Each structure stands twice: as C-alpha cells, then as structure tokens.
C-alpha cells in the first residue's frame, strides 16, 4: 500500500466498523445488550430482511504501530462477537478492521446485494459453534516403556556395554535415532487418533498451528502440543464431543485441552473480500 492509499484509508467521513453478521429474524435489531465496542464505541445493528451487521460508527480504520494497542482492539473485537452471539445465536465473524465507507446506506446496499449468500451461510452455521481441542504430550512415560520393551533399543544398549569408545559413540547415535523414530511414530499416531475421535461428531475440522504455546500452570513443561484442532459441531453435541476425547485423555503422558463454544472464527467465510464499499 502506498502512503497515499494509506492516508485515503485512514480518512473516513462516515465509516461503519463491522464486527459480524447475525440473524435478526427473531430478535429486535436494537437488542445488543450493554456491549460496547472498540474504544467504548456504541454498538448497534444495521439490518435488512432478517440479516444484520453488528457495527459502530467510525471516522478511521484501526491501524497503529503499537502492537499492544492492536492486540487490545482485537480482543475487544472478539469480545463483541462473543457477546452478541448470546443474543442472536451463531454469527458470521468478520475480520478485524473491516470498515465500510458510506454510512448506513452503503452498508444496507451491501447487505441487500449479498443477502442470499449471507442468509445461506447463517442458516448453515445456525446452532453450530467452534470448539478447540489441543493434545499435549509428555513423552517420558512412553520413552520409559519403549526403552524397556523395544528389541532394537535393548540390543543396541547391550552392544554398548562391550564396545570400544568409537563403536559406542556410533551405537549411541543409532540408539538415539531409533528412539526418535519411535517417538515420531507415537506422536503421529496420537494426532491421527485425535482426528478420528472428533470426526463422528464434527461438522467440519481444521488443523491449527501447534507452535502457539498454551500457558497452563497445571501442565508440566515437558508437555508439548502435538495436535491442535478447530472443530465445528452442533452445541447439542458438545457433551458427545467431550466424551469422544476421554479415551485419548486417559493415555499415559497425554493431556487434552477442550475449550468452547466459540463463534466459528476458523470456519466463517471471508465475505468482504474485494468488496467495493470496504475502506
């Protein structure tokens, strides 16, 4: 983006910041509770034929060099989406900093133009929520078991006791490689088992990056996330989804983190891509 484009984006005389799209068929459009938006802005709903955009009025986009400020805005954005979910049911979350120029008239035009798709998406997600499942693994119990039962590892260990220094070094490398191979296989099996466990209950499943750390003092530092899934499922199946995880959670060294329900952040389509009214 050029400096001129950046300046044009930053200057809005009548912008609408959009948090999400909701089904207003059975709920009055003004019923957003006491929720306040980014920078304590008043949140309201602009609705067309039972499809509403949850918005606040703005005169600029939300762009800052201060990453902590951006994070605070993002947290508030998500909080608004979570709050209105309690009122309207499953929403279609919008990307952070989705701003339409042109006031309510431009926004209602967009809602009318995209109404068939929005209606279809809202109906498709109705009653379904996103759950997040993380499998954390402490390999020590597995390593203790495999070193005592793996024939190859035991043979390599026995040979080390009788070998000279040079040969011992090579045998140790072979031992470590074999143990790493068994460890990788176990990680892969656990990840596959997790996917298989949630599949019968899930409407959709998406794998997520495991590098984001989970801060939980109740989990040993030896535990590392080896699989993280976003699961879209009906809220009525929440208990069934949790039950599907019980067998895996009972395995040695395994801890399961199961959170939700959340709005379908992972699964909602990016409806506003290349929209002409978007700032």
UniProtKB/Swiss-Prot annotation:
Keywords (A to Z) from UniProt: Gas vesicle, Plasmid
Primary subcellular site in the record, as a coarse category: other
CC annotations in GO: gas vesicle
Pfam annotation, one family: GvpL_GvpF
Keyword rRNA-binding included in the entry's annotation: no
The organism's place on the tree of life at top rank: Archaea
Family matches, as InterPro entries: Gas_vesic_GvpL, GvpL/GvpF
Compartment(s): Gas vesicle
Record-level GO BP terms: gas vesicle organization
Induction record: In PHH4 (a deletion of the p-vac locus) transcribed in all growth phases, maximal expression in mid-stationary phase. An unstable 6kb transcript able to cover gvpD-gvpE-gvpF-gvpG-gvpH-gvpI-gvpJ-gvpK-gvpL-gvpM is detected, as well as smaller transcripts. Gas vesicles appear earlier when grown in static culture, possibly due to O(2)-limitation.
Heme recorded as keyword: no
Function: Proteins GvpF to GvpM might be involved in nucleating gas vesicle formation. A minor component of the gas vesicle. Gas vesicles are hollow, gas filled proteinaceous nanostructures found in several microbial planktonic microorganisms. They allow positioning of halobacteria at the optimal depth for growth in the poorly aerated, shallow brine pools of their habitat. Expression of 2 c-vac DNA fragments containing 2 divergently transcribed regions (gvpE-gvpF-gvpG-gvpH-gvpI-gvpJ-gvpK-gvpL-gvpM and gvpA-gvpC-gvpN-gvpO) allows H.volcanii to produce gas vesicles.
Subunit structure of this chain's protein: GvpF to GvpM interact with each other in vitro, and may form multi-subunit complex(es). Interacts with GvpC, GvpN and GvpO.
Misc note: Encoded in a 14-gene locus called c-vac which produces cylindrical gas vesicles only in the stationary growth phase.
Family of the protein in this entry: Belongs to the gas vesicle GvpF/GvpL family.
Protein name, UniProt field: Gas vesicle protein L2
Organism: Halobacterium salinarum (strain ATCC 700922 / JCM 11081 / NRC-1) (Halobacterium halobium)
Gene that encodes the chain: gvpL2
């Amino acid at each position: 983006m050029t400096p001129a484009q950046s300046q044009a984006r930053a200057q809005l005389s009548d912008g609408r910041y959009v948090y999400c799209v909701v089904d207003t068929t059975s709920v009055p459009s003004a019923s957003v509770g006491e929720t306040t938006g980014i920078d304590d802005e008043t949140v309201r709903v602009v609705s067309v034929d039972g499809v509403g955009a949850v918005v606040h009025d703005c005169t600029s986009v939300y762009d800052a060099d201060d990453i902590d400020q951006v994070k605070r805005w993002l947290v508030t954005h998500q909080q608004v989406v979570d709050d209105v979910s309690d009122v309207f049911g499953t929403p279609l979350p919008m990307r952070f900093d989705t701003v339409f120029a042109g006031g309510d008239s431009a926004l209602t035009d967009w809602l009318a133009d995209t109404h068939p798709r929005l209606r279809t998406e809202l109906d498709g997600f109705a009653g379904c929520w996103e759950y997040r499942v993380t499998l954390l693994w402490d390999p020590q119990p597995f390593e203790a078991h495999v070193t005592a039962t793996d024939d190859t590892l035991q043979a390599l260990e026995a040979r080390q006791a009788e070998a000279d220094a040079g040969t011992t070094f090579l045998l140790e490398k072979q031992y470590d490689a074999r143990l790493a191979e068994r460890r990788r296989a176990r990680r892969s099996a656990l990840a596959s088992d997790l996917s298989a466990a949630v599949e019968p209950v899930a409407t959709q499943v998406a794998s997520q990056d495991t590098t984001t750390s989970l801060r939980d003092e109740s989990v040993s530092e030896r535990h590392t996330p080896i699989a993280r899934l976003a699961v879209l499922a009906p809220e009525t199946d929440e208990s069934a989804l949790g039950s599907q995880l019980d067998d895996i959670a009972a395995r040695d060294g395994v801890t399961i983190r199961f959170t939700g329900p959340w709005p379908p952040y992972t699964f909602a389509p990016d409806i506003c891509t290349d929209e002409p009214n978007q700032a």
